Amino acid sequence: MKRSEINKALKELEAMCQKHCCYLPPFCHFTPEMWQEIGHEYDEVRDCMLGWDITDYGMGDFDKFGFSLITIRNGNRAMADKYPKVYAEKLLYLKEGQYAPNHFHWFKTEDIINQIGRASCRERV
């Protein structure tokens, strides 16, 4: 994906969160310069890969295949003594007409909770 597409997707997700009073953790608003300055108090964000993720699944058509998400909580199997969570908390945003391919995690539990919008789960063949 082009950086301009990623930036646009981030802005759309931020706008959706703001519109629906969904408050994001402070680290979602850090600039690259801020990340250079913060210390070990944010190691969990780095170690557990919390934050933004924008994907088109390598298909090159974000408006059709892909979504935007923010990982708020996550475990880390490589550091299970420090981060033992076996679940993740993520905010996912799919635009009208977007699809996400089926997938699963061997060692992660996910519950899908629709908080905003409508549920539209279907399998594409």
What are these regions (language model features)?
Residues I116-V125:
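Residue-level detector of conserved catalytic or cofactor/ligand-binding positions
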